[in-house]
């Protein structure tokens, strides 16, 4: 009888137990594909990013022209840059769908895996923000100025902290250099934290749409789910290539085609589309400190989900009232994203304030109350 090579070599044994012979519930749907898609996005970002870093210059006098040089003079530079910029959008689409699936199917019950996932979200958001500054266009410069200025709300340390982050009295060469360093370094940290995320996930075993224990009925990951993931990967890559080749600037901001000018403020400063919902929450509170607190809490509120879970059932599969609340939350986030891209004027201000209030109400009041009501109706 021959021994399988993958089960005798230490490194291959880890790969085998994580991606080949991993016991997986037989009934997980396509919503479980997004974890692997995020891994593909991360690897694609690292590879394209490395090639871009070979030609990019982190200096305010030549950063903008170095991006133009990548597009015009570097062989396939335009393609590498378009793939890098648009796979960031794909990354966030996948990450939001991944979180949405976790919220719907009660994946947050695995508190360690969920907490590390929230940390990963914060790291990815930080990396994307640093990357947005690097082309040194108008929106890059003013986005960096506005967002880093939010640190000044911290009591006592605020103003000093802002100058320390800037490396001077304004966003300048030192800021660009350190942001490039962080943008280069963070993806590798994300890669390491993702490994820990997987480690904790495989410790408990994957959740499934029923929310019930599936230890008695599992199948190996390969070939069943590896081929299923491959289909998802091909669909995502097709969409990414469509964006990169046909409309690479659709998700970007036209202001970034103008080199950074500290003397001219753009009419409407806004971040990338995937941050618009948090930006709308930030803007909806007139007080600066209150806005920053709301911005932070809009992400950190995800850490409270294991504590606010009141239902006797894990998933929302058999809870129609909770499903209605969930889809209302999704619509609310879409409204916030839309409002974040609009100028600060009536009626967008009041819509943003109402949508922001609703966002926190869903997490803190509606979801727990509806879960308790369902328990009552089911006489549990």
Curated annotation (Swiss-Prot):
The keyword Heme applies. Binds 2 heme b groups non-covalently. It is found in: Mitochondrion inner membrane. GO terms for biological process: mitochondrial electron transport, ubiquinol to cytochrome c. Keywords: Electron transport, Heme, Iron, Membrane, Metal-binding, Mitochondrion, Mitochondrion inner membrane, Respiratory chain, Transmembrane, Transmembrane helix, Transport, Ubiquinone. Its cofactor is heme b. Its main location: mitochondrion. A ubiquinone binds at residue 202. Heme b b562 binds at residues 84, 183. The chain crosses the membrane at residues 34-54, 78-99, 114-134, 179-199, 227-247, 289-309, 321-341, 348-368. The cytochrome bc1 complex contains 3 respiratory subunits (MT-CYB, CYC1 and UQCRFS1), 2 core proteins (UQCRC1 and UQCRC2) and probably 6 low-molecular weight proteins. This is Cytochrome b. It comes from Zootoca vivipara (Common lizard).
